[in-house]
From Swiss-Prot:
Gene Ontology molecular-function annotations: all-trans retinoic acid 18-hydroxylase activity; all-trans retinoic acid 4-hydrolase activity; heme binding; iron ion binding; monooxygenase activity; oxidoreductase activity, acting on paired donors, with incorporation or reduction of molecular oxygen, NAD(P)H as one donor, and incorporation of one atom of oxygen; oxygen binding; retinoic acid 4-hydroxylase activity
Tissue: Expressed in most fetal and adult tissues with highest levels in adult liver, heart, pituitary gland, adrenal gland, placenta and regions of the brain. Expressed at high levels in lung, pancreas, skin and uterus (at protein level). Lower expression level is detected in spleen, kidney, intestine and adipose tissue (at protein level).
Name by which UniProt lists this protein: Cytochrome P450 26A1
Membrane topology qualifier: Peripheral membrane protein
Function: A cytochrome P450 monooxygenase involved in the metabolism of retinoates (RAs), the active metabolites of vitamin A, and critical signaling molecules in animals. RAs exist as at least four different isomers: all-trans-RA (atRA), 9-cis-RA, 13-cis-RA, and 9,13-dicis-RA, where atRA is considered to be the biologically active isomer, although 9-cis-RA and 13-cis-RA also have activity.
Protein's organism: Homo sapiens (Human)
Family that this chain belongs to: Belongs to the cytochrome P450 family.
Lineage summary: Eukaryota, Metazoa, Chordata, Craniata, Vertebrata
Catalyzed reactions: all-trans-retinoate + reduced [NADPH--hemoprotein reductase] + O2 = all-trans-(4S)-hydroxyretinoate + oxidized [NADPH--hemoprotein reductase] + H2O + H(+); all-trans-(4S)-hydroxyretinoate + reduced [NADPH--hemoprotein reductase] + O2 = all-trans-(4S,16)-dihydroxyretinoate + oxidized [NADPH--hemoprotein reductase] + H2O + H(+); all-trans-retinoate + reduced [NADPH--hemoprotein reductase] + O2 = all-trans-18-hydroxyretinoate + oxidized [NADPH--hemoprotein reductase] + H2O + H(+)
InterPro entries associated with the record: Cyt_P450, Cyt_P450_CS, Cyt_P450_E_grp-IV, Cyt_P450_sf
Cellular location(s): Endoplasmic reticulum membrane; Microsome membrane
EC number: 1.14.13.-
Conditions for induction: By retinoic acid.
């Protein structure tokens, strides 16, 4: 074969497909950008739209932190991209986030990716809008009143104490912290939010099966909206269906108990409140909506708190001087003495633990469990000199906003004392947003704060521990967790500081 023939063959085999691929990317970019509002003179934010149809979803899923850091360095606090099948503008920074969070119903509305809406369902709180969202949120908020939280304290303390005893019994072999914390938080969420014992959800292995199903659903929650066998959406829906089947048993048992007046007059869990709200309005119970709400409550009630609690163990293990200060605060309140270790915690005591509150805040600043929130533009509007076209998705980034917040110095340092200092209310309001903000802020944030405080108190006054692999590499999918599941060895703390 002559040289011209070889060159022609190489052209057909390598060069031509490459040129076609580059042309396809350019045409895709032009197609996406054509969705701009031509009646608005402002430019679109800078950025790229990735590959045809897939956009930049795969890059973000596979290299999340590296990908997002590269984007921030290249484009700044606002840029366009294409994620989960939609043209998207990603924003960060207190001023930009303020516009988004305070613009609910006026500029933007909540709009999670299609995969999230499909898996969680239209009947869950995060996917409701307007009056339906307002009414549902009002009902669920009653489960997180101060009176209700006071009732939850002994339940949380009991579950945490039981888990710590098991961790301590592992001895030298140690354990994987993250899976254990997830099981703990799942049991707490089952008891408090759904009002049922985990082991009563079905057969003897139901707790572990439900936890594993939630893990599978969570892994595939943010997927391309393609429902074919073995796709992420397909696997997520399959896990969701298993969860619904298990939860339906609990819901039917709950309904029978309420009709028989077995619930008593004590604190009401969120599921009971939703059922009674339907009865009070004379509505027929919608089993599908109850299953969707229960799944959402369990997901939010254990997935995010497990992430935060694991990060607490990580940072307190890496910074012993902070753990020392936690114990000094406990000692000052009489909570570290042997004679007082059996005293019951209550809301009044927990609210006095200011430094522990700062440790939790600093943990949530560095490792917010949820990295951001999703909105859709209701109309074209201006943000930082760029147009946000009507119909485009808007993602506000919690983790990036914390990273760039000007009110924090030495941002990469774990320093709970920074929260002991007063910050201007207006400046800090949107610089620290682990629970989101505005009308769509996390409905269970006070529950999460109390749970994490109790967890920290019990951990600090009963345990010492060693992280066997040192500082872990963190990954987000969709909540933050350690890639190695955080192997650690726990030993008894003997009360001496």
């Amino acid at each position: 074969m002559g040289l011209p023939a070889l060159l022609a063959s190489a052209l057909c085999t390598f060069v031509l497909p490459l040129l076609l691929f580059l042309a396809a990317i350019k045409l895709w970019d032009l197609y996406c950008v054509s969705g701009r509002d031509r009646s608005c003179a402002l430019p679109l934010p800078p950025g790229t739209m990735g590959f045809p149809f897939f956009g930049e979803t795969l890059q973000m899923v596979l290299q999340r932190r590296k990908f997002l850091q590269m984007k921030r360095r290249k484009y700044g606090f606002i840029y366009k991209t294409h994620l989960f099948g939609r043209p998207t503008v990603r924003v960060m920074g207190a001023d930009n986030v303020r516009r988004i969070l305070l613009g609910e119903h006026r500029l933007v509305s909540v709009h999670w990716p299609a995969s999230v809406r499909t898996i969680l369902g239209s009947g869950c709180l995060s996917n409701l809008h307007d009056s339906s969202h307002k009414q549902r949120k009002k009902v669920i908020m009653r489960a997180f009143s101060r009176e209700a939280l006071e009732c939850y304290v002994p339940v949380i303390t009991e579950e945490v104490g039981s888990s710590l005893e098991q961790w301590l019994s592992c001895g030298e072999r140690g354990l994987l912290v993250y899976p254990e914390v997830k099981r703990l938080m799942f049991r707490i969420a089952m008891r408090i939010l759904l009002g049922c014992e985990p082991q009563l959800a079905g057969d003897g292995d139901s707790e572990q099966q439900l936890v594993e199903a939630f893990e599978e659903m969570t892994r595939n929650l943010f997927s391309l909206p393609i429902d074919v066998p073995f796709s992420g959406l397909y696997r997520g829906m399959k896990a969701r269906n298993l969860i619904h089947a298990r939860i339906e048993q609990n819901i039917r048992a709950k309904i029978c108990g309420l009709r028989a007046s077995e619930a008593g007059q004590g604190c009401k869990d969120a599921l009971q409140l939703l059922i009674e709200h339907s009865w009070e309005r004379g509505e027929r119970l919608d089993m599908q909506a109850l299953k969707q709400s229960s799944t959402e409550l369990l997901f939010g009630g254990h997935e995010t708190t497990a992430s935060a609690a694991t990060s607490l163990i990580t940072y307190l293990g890496l910074y012993p001087h902070v753990l020392q200060k936690v114990r000094e605060e406990l000692k000052s309140k009489g909570l570290l003495c042997k004679s007082n270790q059996d005293n019951k915690l209550d809301m009044e005591i927990l609210e006095q633990l200011k430094y522990i509150g700062c440790v939790i805040k600093e943990t949530l600043r560095l490792n917010p469990p949820v990295p951001g929130g999703f909105r859709v533009a209701l109309k074209t509007f201006e943000l930082n000199g760029y147009q946000i076209p009507k119909g485009w998705n808007v993602i506000y980034s919690i983790c990036d906003t914390h990273d760039v917040a000007e009110i924090f110095t030495n941002k990469e340092e774990f320093n709970p004392d920074r929260f002991m200092l007063p910050h201007p209310e207006d400046a800090s309001r949107f610089s620290f947003i682990p629970f989101g903000g505005g009308l769509r802020s996390c409905v269970g944030k006070e529950f999460a704060k109390i749970l994490l405080k109790i967890f920290t108190v019990e951990l600090a006054r009963h345990c010492d521990w060693q992280l066997l692999n040192g500082p872990p590499t963190m990954k987000t999918s969709p909540t933050v967790y350690p890639v190695d599941n955080l192997p650690a060895r726990f030993t008894h703390f003997h009360g001496e500081i």
